[in-house]
Amino acid sequence: MAEKQKHDGRVKIGHYVLGDTLGVGTFGKVKIGEHQLTGHKVAVKILNRQKIRSLDVVGKIKREIQNLKLFRHPHIIKLYQVISTPTDFFMVMEYVSGGELFDYICKHGRVEEMEARRLFQQILSAVDYCHRHMVVHRDLKPENVLLDAHMNAKIADFGLSNIMSDGEFLRTSCGSPNYAAPEVISGRLYAGPEVDIWSCGVILYALLCGTLPFDDEHVPTLFKKIRGGVFYIPEYLNRSVATLLMHMLQVDPLKRATIKDIREHEWFKQDLPSYLFPEDPSYDANVIDDEAVKEVCEKFECTESEVMNSLYSGDPQDQLAVAYHLIIDNRRIMNQASEFYLASSPPSGSFMDDSAMHIPPGLKPHPERMPPLIADSPKARCPLDALNTTKPKSLAVKKAKWHLGIRSQSKPYDIMAEVYRAMKQLDFEWKVVNAYHLRVRRKNPVTGNYVKMSLQLYLVDNRSYLLDFKSIDDEVVEQRSGSSTPQRSCSAAGLHRPRSSFDSTTAESHSLSGSLTGSLTGSTLSSVSPRLGSHTMDFFEMCASLITTLAR
């Protein structure tokens, strides 16, 4: 059972650092989270155990978790894992930034026919996927259709769904009245799939018209309208789509359109992407993405066979499987869902590519590479001038002081993840100043005194970074930090065997043996003079132990 921790003043649960609240539901909040190792954003639904019990919705929550764990579809919100604490459940799900389709329609009104068709095709593909996996959603509505940054639809909230069995009829009346089928509000028996078709028809109408086909503030009157099945069709609607709507909103479920009928309709087939209805129904489980597997191996410093075993084990809580699905989904999102999840290999470039990353917040250029502050000309500001050893040094630059550090051409996120892993292994304690600046201490087992140092990652040039080690004297006033208390090494819990950020790929930048000698370079940092005697030796021993651990 996981425990809540503090990270830079924010709550950390498992691998995820929680951020702002995205919304508040009946059972708790939904917050944005960030996977500490991969950097991917997720949505974390927080379910309070006591509230779940008091509202008697344990079964509803269990169904939602059970269903989402099974699903891997580009237009269904994915559940990556569930983390339990004594007080709460944390459902870690796919994050989308576009909000609800309901809010989009309220703000923009009816959608252009071509765009409405594109969204409806995505929604129906997701519903078809549910039905093929014997799951009926039963509460489809624009509020449960989310939009990502590229205006792709994602179905969410499977709490009301039932898994279908042959010959089984559902008697439960649930869902929102405006979108509910006549047989649902009448309490009649229904098989399941046909109620989702009705709801899809209401959603399509809302997309095309900007209003609902059945609406009334007086609920009995609303029910009468739904049972009568009479709704207004605007003149501007294409005749072809009007016939489709009438077929989907048939009161008699036996006469209502099926998914097969909709897929064969001429209006629906226009510009239909092939990935939405793949011919091979086994696409969602049997094809493993080799590039994603390799990326997991690099990040967690594990073998491909370990990743494959995790994927085939079927354990959704396995950290390697969770990281694999995060990588896959985010690559697909960046590709605007143009290829189906697991149907083929996504592009090899990472969404965290250096060219798109520029300088992350909190990461500073190394002072050695910063321009002198005596002129305002572009030439004086150019970092390349600082690299030119043939040029006379500006008088404004102080005499350089030696420092100890490690250079790397890995991504800054990977470097810091490796540092956290090493500190955890060494049982160091630390306080986060920002994402790339830590204050670290270690207790001398003999004297009982604490040795302190500062670790800061600097941008040396557009290709490499420098992890700087600096001694901290006890007399120095601590900088203000986002964390109120120093973090124990457990704050990096779950960073299981990340890839070494200092693997040898170039002679100067990645060799640790070369780093110790090559990184004794000039720095304009105003370092604190360490205390004489044992403190200096303790500091260097602390540096040596960290460097040795990073080299493993």
Swiss-Prot record:
Cross-referenced InterPro entries: AMPK_C (IPR032270), AMPKA2_C (IPR039148), KA1/Ssp2_C (IPR028375), Kinase-like_dom_sf (IPR011009), PRKAA1/2_AID (IPR049020), PRKAA2 (IPR028783), Prot_kinase_dom (IPR000719), Protein_kinase_ATP_BS (IPR017441)
Record field: compositional bias (Polar residues): 480-490, 501-510
Any one cellular-component term (Gene Ontology): cytoplasm
Entry's EC annotation: 2.7.11.1, 2.7.11.31
Entry binding sites for ATP: L22, G23, V24, G25, T26, F27, G28, K29, V30, K45
Catalytic reaction list: L-seryl-[protein] + ATP = O-phospho-L-seryl-[protein] + ADP + H(+); L-threonyl-[protein] + ATP = O-phospho-L-threonyl-[protein] + ADP + H(+); L-seryl-[acetyl-CoA carboxylase] + ATP = O-phospho-L-seryl-[acetyl-CoA carboxylase] + ADP + H(+); L-seryl-[3-hydroxy-3-methylglutaryl-coenzyme A reductase] + ATP = O-phospho-L-seryl-[3-hydroxy-3-methylglutaryl-coenzyme A reductase] + ADP + H(+)
PROSITE patterns: PROTEIN_KINASE_ATP, PROTEIN_KINASE_DOM, PROTEIN_KINASE_ST
Residue segments, region Disordered: 477-521
Region (AIS): 291-376
Compositional bias of kind Low complexity: 511-521
Activity regulation info: Activated by phosphorylation on Thr-172. Binding of AMP to non-catalytic gamma subunit (PRKAG1, PRKAG2 or PRKAG3) results in allosteric activation, inducing phosphorylation on Thr-172. AMP-binding to gamma subunit also sustains activity by preventing dephosphorylation of Thr-172. ADP also stimulates Thr-172 phosphorylation, without stimulating already phosphorylated AMPK. ATP promotes dephosphorylation of Thr-172, rendering the enzyme inactive. Under physiological conditions AMPK mainly exists in its inactive form in complex with ATP, which is much more abundant than AMP.
Keyword list, A-Z: ATP-binding, Autophagy, Biological rhythms, Cholesterol biosynthesis, Cholesterol metabolism, Chromatin regulator, Cytoplasm, Fatty acid biosynthesis, Fatty acid metabolism, Kinase, Lipid biosynthesis, Lipid metabolism, Magnesium, Metal-binding, Nucleotide-binding, Nucleus, Phosphoprotein, Serine/threonine-protein kinase, Steroid biosynthesis, Steroid metabolism, Sterol biosynthesis, Sterol metabolism, Transcription, Transcription regulation, Transferase, Ubl conjugation, Wnt signaling pathway
Residue positions, PTM Phosphothreonine: T172, T258
Function of the protein: Catalytic subunit of AMP-activated protein kinase (AMPK), an energy sensor protein kinase that plays a key role in regulating cellular energy metabolism. In response to reduction of intracellular ATP levels, AMPK activates energy-producing pathways and inhibits energy-consuming processes: inhibits protein, carbohydrate and lipid biosynthesis, as well as cell growth and proliferation. AMPK acts via direct phosphorylation of metabolic enzymes, and by longer-term effects via phosphorylation of transcription regulators.
Protein name: 5'-AMP-activated protein kinase catalytic subunit alpha-2
Source organism: Pongo abelii
Gene name of the encoded protein: PRKAA2
